[in-house]
Swiss-Prot record:
The keyword Transferase does not apply. Disulfide bonds: none annotated. It comes from Zygnema circumcarinatum. One of its GO terms (molecular function) is rRNA binding. This is Small ribosomal subunit protein uS14c. The keyword Amino-acid biosynthesis does not apply. Binds 16S rRNA, required for the assembly of 30S particles. Belongs to the universal ribosomal protein uS14 family. Keywords: Chloroplast, Plastid, Ribonucleoprotein, Ribosomal protein, RNA-binding, rRNA-binding. One of its GO terms (biological process) is translation. SUPFAM superfamilies: Glucocorticoid receptor-like (DNA-binding domain). Gene3D superfamilies: 1.10.287.1480.
Length: 100
């Protein structure tokens, strides 16, 4: 089980990402449309003034059950350990054990 502080930190990052996503997107479009170099620099400074944790690249996926940051499957939002346990307990509909 992950520390509660790290799980809360990730939640805070995802909230900041959602809050600033439109502003960040519009500033990036303005940079691409800017004609002069000074104009691009001023827009870039505005972009740099935004909180670091508002960038989407800083958000890391975590398992919903355990909070584990590694081996998290996007389809389920669960780590491989939890998927295995839940699949064996028939708690994931449509998931079957592979055999060939």
């Amino acid at each position: 089980m992950a520390k509660k502080s790290s799980i809360e930190r990730e939640k805070k990052r995802s909230e900041l990402t959602q809050k600033y996503s439109n502003l960040r997107k519009s500033l990036k479009e303005m940079i691409h449309q800017a004609s002069s170099l000074e104009e691009k620099w001023s827009i870039q400074r505005q972009l740099q003034r935004l909180p670091r944790n508002s960038a989407a690249t800083r958000v890391h996926r975590r398992c919903f059950v355990t909070g584990r940051p590694r081996a998290v499957y996007r389809d389920f939002g669960l780590s491989r350990h939890v998927i295995r346990e839940m699949a064996h307990a028939c708690l994931l509909p449509g998931v079957i054990k592979a055999s060939w």
